């Protein structure tokens, strides 16, 4: 009996030690263009295959419809959650064509809390949002914050920089809880909004990994950033080689969350 007890104690100790080590997190950001591909077809199963192909833990989705006529009145977050076996969270920002339009998150882990924050909006009927979830990591590792967003596309837009400031102000209230923000920022790495975010967050790739236009990408406007920098190691960031399912390419970051 003492031998069994010793082995159990050893296994428990090893488990506790493992839980204190780095923890891998795979994040995907994907502007899905409401599921409409370059062939003009709305095909959520095709979008789901792109997502499933990299087996992410957290997914930030932009340009997502729910109950909208143009996409067959489908609840796209729910459908993608079912297809990918992930928990869907939807942040509706605009009433459109009989339904709602906004950002969504898919999560492998339980969602403890969610909030949809409004960002600055200078254009009628084009409210922008920042969707936030707090997920509970396994093995007692604590909470992780994940944000999905889509910032205005217009050149010299008056919205983008204030939106970035709002994101930074929000994370300043979170007391250093590890966080990731991912989305279509509609700016290259040297754009004012991305530079503003980088005062607080760390981009998961240096230089530029082009994500748009989808057929022959020439610029990176989709980004993944982490906070605080000391809690994260970037293992890999890459753009997925898929050019039909949407008008953007998806970007994947493989990260390690370090012990506090």
Segments from the language model and where they lie:
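N-terminal, active-site-proximal structural segment of metallo-dependent hydrolase catalytic domains
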Residues: 2-3, 11-83, 90, 95-103, ...
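Beta-strand-turn-beta hairpins that frame and shape the catalytic cleft
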Residues: 19-27, 99-101, 107-113, 125-148, ...
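Active site of divalent-metal-dependent phosphoester/diester hydrolases
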Residues: 40, 68-73, 86-105, 124-127, ...
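Active-site beta-strand/loop signature of hydrolases that rely on acidic residues for catalysis
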Residues: 24-32, 47-73, 106, 133, ...
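Surface-exposed cleft-lining segments at the edges of enzyme active sites
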Residues: 34-36, 116-121, 149-157
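Short, solvent-exposed loop/turn segments at secondary-structure junctions
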Residues: 35, 95, 111, 151-153, ...
